[in-house]
Regions:
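Conserved N-terminal beta-strand and adjoining loop/helix that marks the start
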Residues: 1-19, 35
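Conserved hydrophobic/aromatic beta-strand scaffold that supports enzyme active sites
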Residues: 12, 21, 83-85, 103
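Short, charged/polar surface micro-motifs in flexible loops or helix N-caps
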Residues: 14-19, 27-28, 40, 73-74, ...
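NUDIX/MutT-family hydrolases
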Residues: 94-126, 144-147
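Conserved Nudix-box catalytic region and its N-terminal flanking loop in Nudix hydrolases
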Residues: 18-54, 140-147
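Active-site-adjacent beta-strand/loop module that shapes the phosphate/pyrophosphate-binding cleft
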Residues: 72-92, 121-125, 129
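A short coil-to-beta-strand element that immediately follows conserved catalytic motifs
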Residues: 59-68
Length: 147
């Protein structure tokens, strides 16, 4: 059976020592995270992250940099989250149906109610020697690996 792949993105928008966070309302994955979403059919990865940040925050980012990935495989399907960072933006900040957006000090993020696994994802965003957060199944259990 061929493998299907779903591509999504997440962007850490930086403004000095502050980062833009989103307090997600989705009960399937609630908590503090970064804006992002699905790559649409025929859309480039870069265009997708620019569009998603704009839709969810009102900010137009430019020159986002790919800094890592999160991925997992289950039942002939792979899910890939592309991690971007951006420090150039324009526009007026506003929240969306995805959740409230606001600026927080980067140093304060570990104290906030982060979405599940967001602490490990944050390491991939920040640590230059990490580029992948991978889930695999071993003996019926999900194992997390930071690479």
């Amino acid at each position: 059976m061929p493998e299907s792949v779903t591509f999504t993105n997440m962007c850490m928008v930086c403004d000095g020592d502050r980062v833009l966070v989103q307090d997600r309302l989705d009960p399937a994955w609630p908590g503090i995270t970064f804006p992002g979403g699905h790559v649409e059919e025929g859309e480039s990865f870069t265009d997708a992250v620019i569009r998603e940040v704009w839709e969810e925050t009102g900010l137009r980012i430019s020159a986002p940099r790919l800094v890592g990935v999160k991925d997992w495989y289950s039942d002939h399907s792979r899910y890939v989250v592309l991690f971007y960072r951006a420090d150039r933006f324009s526009g007026t900040l506003h929240s969306s149906e995805e959740g409230e957006v606001r600026w927080e000090a980067l140093a304060d993020l570990p104290k906030l109610p982060l979405a599940p696994d967001m602490g490990d994802m944050l390491r991939v965003f920040l640590e230059e020697d990490l580029s992948e957060f991978y889930y695999r199944i071993e003996d019926g259990n999900w194992i997390q690996e930071l690479k």
